[in-house]
Amino acid sequence: MFFNRERELEKLLRLVSTEPNLITFVYGPINSGKTALMMEFIKKLPDDHIAFYINLRRTPITSYSDFVDVLFSVEFRNKVKTLKEAVSLVLSAGKETFGFPVPTELLARITKEKKPKNAFAYIVTLMEEVRKAGKRPILILDELQVIGDLKVDGSLIYELFNFFIHLTKESHLSHVFVVTSDSLFIERVYSEAMLQGRAEYFLVDDFKRETALRFLKNNGLSDDEAELVWNYFGGKPVYLAETIKHRDELKEWCERMLKLRTSQILDELYALEKELFEKVVKLFFAFEKQESVPYRSLSEEILWAVKRNILFAEPVDRVLRPQGRLELLAIKRILDIIE
């Protein structure tokens, strides 16, 4: 759902009007509207820009060949025989292309050799040709964390980081946007020495109260109904959009969603051994009277809660908070149940 993200859009558009220098990591709580924002960003790009958009969640990625399949989109298979044809295909695509067109024989070689640097070298060549033709390439990778542990003669993620550094800080060839909802991944990135001075961080958060209420009222909810929804879901875009479908049973639906989330967390909690269970409960008590708490390091209980999308770890400010208001309410109910 895209609504009232003009400030974020303006920042992104201003960023791509300058020379590429830094990798931009776009992050935030789960379902905060990051992908919707990037899709709208692509639509608003000036005509002399073209975005190569790759969603790594589109298909399961468990091997290098899976990664190549997503990188070099199947929609271009058997359509391209030369680099010139690949460039022409990109230039005719408008502002966006899903993946990179690649000559068939070269793709077979890239897949067989299992050397990421060969795939990246081709992408650089393609982008250089696109640039010569008067277009400014932009690379957007959505959900990069899904390949975080994939090994191809070493960690693929580090090969990618080096590639991104080359595209931005070294060659100034392309802006690079990496989108993720995984706060453990962004914490890892934020602490990565090789990215110091080579990356910036762009937070896409849930809507503020004023924005959420305006969206709900614009879609026909009364003041009281909008307040009810805010009290259950805060500014989480996905729930605000779903609310419109359930207006005839609004209170019941909101309560049902809270019961479901509470039950899901309890199922996970009750499966823990006693020591970790007690640590998690103690962590939950930190949110009994406040919505965010500082953290020094990612302890066992924090890792458990973040991996299960109960809590969101914000590495820049080093604070923990529930993934959304629904999780905050569920935590409070759980504390009432287990006391």
From Swiss-Prot:
MF (Gene Ontology): ATP binding; ATP hydrolysis activity
Keyword Nucleotide-binding set for record: yes
InterPro entries: AAA+_ATPase, Archaeal_ATPase_domain, ATPase_dom, MJ1010-like_2nd, P-loop_NTPase, WH-like_DNA-bd_sf
Keyword DNA repair: no
UniProtKB keywords: ATP-binding, Nucleotide-binding
Organism domain of life: Archaea
Gene3D superfamilies, per database record: P-loop containing nucleotide triphosphate hydrolases (3.40.50.300), Winged helix-like DNA-binding domain superfamily/Winged helix DNA-binding domain (1.10.10.10)
Sections of the chain in a coiled coil: none
Residues reported to bind ATP: 28-35
Family named by the database record: Belongs to the archaeal ATPase family.
Full protein name: Uncharacterized ATP-binding protein PYRAB09480
Organism: Pyrococcus abyssi (strain GE5 / Orsay)
